[in-house]
Curated annotation (Swiss-Prot):
<feature type="binding site">
    <location>
        <begin position="195"/>
        <end position="198"/>
    </location>
    <ligand>
        <name>ATP</name>
    </ligand>
</feature>
<dbReference type="Pfam" id="PF21244">
    <property type="entry name" value="PurT_C"/>
</dbReference>
<dbReference type="GO" id="GO:0004644">
    <property type="term" value="F:phosphoribosylglycinamide formyltransferase activity"/>
</dbReference>
<feature type="binding site">
    <location>
        <position position="286"/>
    </location>
    <ligand>
        <name>N(1)-(5-phospho-beta-D-ribosyl)glycinamide</name>
    </ligand>
</feature>
<dbReference type="GO" id="GO:0043815">
    <property type="term" value="F:phosphoribosylglycinamide formyltransferase 2 activity"/>
</dbReference>
<feature type="binding site">
    <location>
        <begin position="22"/>
        <end position="23"/>
    </location>
    <ligand>
        <name>N(1)-(5-phospho-beta-D-ribosyl)glycinamide</name>
    </ligand>
</feature>
<keyword id="KW-0479">Metal-binding</keyword>
<feature type="domain" description="ATP-grasp">
    <location>
        <begin position="119"/>
        <end position="308"/>
    </location>
</feature>
<comment type="pathway">
    <text>Purine metabolism; IMP biosynthesis via de novo pathway; N(2)-formyl-N(1)-(5-phospho-D-ribosyl)glycinamide from N(1)-(5-phospho-D-ribosyl)glycinamide (formate route): step 1/1.</text>
</comment>
<dbReference type="GO" id="GO:0000287">
    <property type="term" value="F:magnesium ion binding"/>
</dbReference>
<feature type="binding site">
    <location>
        <begin position="160"/>
        <end position="165"/>
    </location>
    <ligand>
        <name>ATP</name>
    </ligand>
</feature>
<comment type="function">
    <text>Involved in the de novo purine biosynthesis. Catalyzes the transfer of formate to 5-phospho-ribosyl-glycinamide (GAR), producing 5-phospho-ribosyl-N-formylglycinamide (FGAR). Formate is provided by PurU via hydrolysis of 10-formyl-tetrahydrofolate.</text>
</comment>
<keyword id="KW-0460">Magnesium</keyword>
<dbReference type="GO" id="GO:0005524">
    <property type="term" value="F:ATP binding"/>
</dbReference>
<dbReference type="InterPro" id="IPR016185">
    <property type="entry name" value="PreATP-grasp_dom_sf"/>
</dbReference>
<keyword id="KW-0658">Purine biosynthesis</keyword>
<comment type="similarity">
    <text>Belongs to the PurK/PurT family.</text>
</comment>
Length: 393
C-alpha cells in the first residue's frame, strides 16, 4: 500500500525531477496536491517546475557527477526524468544502486537516442516503422538518402522539439539538411537517422499509462506540427476501430518493453487502417496538454498516480477538446501577457502561462485550451483564445 508522509519532515515522500519545464510543472502541481515533497532540477534558474517545487538545484544534467551529487544529497524515493538531455548512464547506475527511476532508467536511456528506440521497435519488437538508415558521415548520409529516395526525413539521433529535423524533397536539400541536423543535435555534431517518408493521413499521440492495475489508454490525441514542433492538438482524434486497436497494440508492445510505471506518449502515423510506430516519450507529452481540459484526470495527474503506485480505475473524457500554443518571438526576461479577459471570454476555455523566465528567439510560453461540440469548433475556439493573448516583451 502506498503511504505518503509529511513534506519537509522525516516521513516525507520525495520526488526529484530531472528537467523542470512546463510539463514537469503540471506533474509537480499534481504531486503537491497529494502532499509529496518535490525537488526540481534543471540547467537554468527559475524554470517553470522550480516555481512550484519545495526547492531546486541548477546543474548541467548531462554531467553525470553533478547529477549523482544532487541525487545522493536529496535521497529521493522517485527520480522523474522530464526531458531527454540527461546523463542517462548515471541514472542506470543509480537505479542499480537502489534508486527508483520513472518509468525505468533503461527507458530514459533508450528514448534519449532515436537509434535505441527505433531498433527496439523495428528490430526486436518487429513493429511497423518507416524504412530507415543511420549515418555518421556525410557520405553515409548521402547514400542513405539515395537508397530511400525523395521525399525523406532526416533527424539528429539526439534532439527534441523538432530541432535539426528536415524534410528532403530533392537533391537541392541534401547539403543544407545535413548542416541543419549537425546544428540541431543535443549532444553536438554526429549521427543522424534518415527515414523514408510515410504518406500518412494523420498522426496521433496515444497517451499510454502503465500503473499498478495494468495499462490504460487515453483517447487518441491528434496534432498539427510545424518544423517538428507541436502547434495545436485535439482529442479525441477520429479513427477507424481497426486503426485504434492496432495503435493500442503497438503502444502496449513498446511500453511493455520499456517497463516501469508512468505515462508514455506514443507517436504513431495512421493511413486508413494502417499504423506505423514513430517515437515514444517515457513521460507526459506536449501534445497531451489538451488533457488539462479534456479529461477528469489529465496526463499529469495520471503520471503522478502511476509514480506513487495509486490506482487508475477510470479516465473520463469530457468530449471534443483542443489546445493551441502561445508562441512568443523576440528577446525578453520580463515577458508580460495582456488581453487575457478576451482570451477567456468564451465558455469552456482555459489558459496555462508557463512562467518561463526568458525568451530568446521563438519559445512556447503558454497554451490555450477549449472544449466544444465538435473537434473543429474546439480547435477554432482554442486558436481564438491563443491569438487573443497579447504579448509584451
Amino acid at each position: 500500500m502506498t503511504q505518503i508522509g509529511t513534506p519537509l519532515s522525516p516521513t516525507a515522500t520525495r520526488v526529484l525531477f530531472c528537467g523542470s519545464g512546463e510539463l514537469g510543472k503540471e506533474v509537480v502541481i499534481e504531486l503537491q496536491r497529494l502532499g509529496v515533497e518535490v525537488i526540481a532540477v534543471d540547467r537554468y534558474e527559475n524554470a517553470p517546475a522550480m516555481q512550484v517545487a519545495h526547492r531546486s538545484h541548477v546543474i548541467n544534467m548531462l554531467d553525470g557527477a553533478a547529477l549523482r551529487a544532487v541525487i545522493e544529497a536529496e535521497k529521493p524515493h522517485f527520480i522523474v526524468p522530464e526531458i531527454e538531455a540527461i546523463a542517462t548512464a548515471t541514472l542506470v547506475e543509480l537505479e542499480a544502486e537502489g534508486f527508483t527511476v520513472i518509468p525505468t532508467a533503461r527507458a530514459a536511456q533508450l528514448t534519449m537516442n532515436r537509434e535505441g528506440i527505433r531498433r527496439l521497435a523495428a528490430e526486436e519488437l518487429k513493429l511497423p516503422t518507416s524504412p530507415y538508415h543511420f549515418a555518421d558521415t556525410f557520405e553515409a548520409y548521402s547514400k542513405a538518402v539515395e537508397d530511400l529516395g525523395f521525399p525523406c526525413v532526416v533527424k539528429p539521433v539526439m534532439s527534441s522539439s523538432g530541432k535539426g529535423q528536415s524534410l528532403l524533397k530533392s537533391t537541392d536539400d541534401v547539403q543544407k539538411a545535413w548542416d541543419y541536423a549537425q546544428e540541431g543535435g543535443r549532444a553536438g555534431k554526429g549521427r543522424v537517422i534518415v527515414e523514408g517518408f510515410i504518406d500518412f493521413d494523420y498522426e496521433i499521440t496515444l497517451l499510454t499509462v502503465r500503473h499498478i492495475g495494468g495499462t490504460t489508454f487515453c483517447a487518441p490525441v491528434g496534432h498539427r506540427q510545424e518544423k517538428g514542433d507541436y502547434q495545436e492538438s485535439w482529442q479525441p482524434q477520429a479513427m477507424s476501430p481497426v486503426a485504434l486497436a492496432e495503435s493500442e497494440r503497438v503502444a502496449k508492445a513498446v511500453t511493455e518493453a520499456l517497463g516501469g510505471r508512468g505515462m508514455f506518449g506514443v507517436e504513431l502515423f495512421i493511413k486508413g487502417d494502417q499504423v506505423w510506430f514513430s517515437e515514444v516519450s517515457p513521460r507526459p507529452h506536449d501534445t497531451g496538454l489538451v488533457t488539462l481540459i479534456s479529461q477528469d484526470l489529465s496526463q499529469f495527474a495520471l503520471h503522478a498516480r502511476a509514480i506513487l503506485g495509486l490506482p487508475i480505475p477510470l479516465i473520463r473524457q469530457f468530449g471534443p477538446s483542443a489546445s493551441a500554443v502561445i508562441l512568443v518571438e523576440g528577446q525578453s526576461t520580463q515577458t508580460a501577457f495582456a488581453n487575457l479577459g478576451a482570451a477567456l471570454a468564451e465558455p469552456d476555455t482555459a489558459l496555462r502561462l508557463f512562467g518561463k523566465p526568458e525568451v530568446n528567439g521563438q519559445r512556447r510560453m503558454g497554451v490555450a485550451l477549449a472544449r466544444d461540440e465538435s473537434i473543429e469548433a474546439a480547435r477554432a475556439k482554442a486558436t481564438r483564445a491563443s491569438q487573443a493573448v497579447n504579448v509584451e516583451l
